[in-house]
Amino acid sequence: MRLWLLEKRKYREKTQDYIAYKARISRSMYAMIESGERNPSVPVAKKIAKVLNFDWTLFFEE
């Protein structure tokens, strides 16, 4: 579970649907990324990070 990602999304009061829409991925893909089931590609990591305003390399520090 990527709690840090969940916390960033909740802090900004955004839904998984909203983040997925803005990042141009499916909600199910975003849910799998947030839960830690899947790792995002670099382009997807950059899109999610842009929407939530954080450094995309956080995805790859785990």
Model-derived features: positions:
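Residues in the helix-turn-helix
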Residues: 18, 29, 58
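Key DNA-contacting residues within the recognition helix of helix-turn-helix
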Residues: 6, 31-32, 60
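DNA major-groove recognition helix of helix-turn-helix/homeodomain DNA-binding modules
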Residues: 24, 43-58
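Extended rod-forming repeat segments used as scaffolds/tethers
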Residues: 37, 41-44, 62
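Recognition helix of helix-turn-helix/homeodomain-like DNA-binding domains
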Residues: 25-40
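Helix-turn-helix DNA-binding elements, focusing on the entry/boundary residues of the two helices
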Residues: 5, 16, 27, 42-45
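Short basic helix-loop element that most often maps to the first helix and adjoining turn
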Residues: 3-22
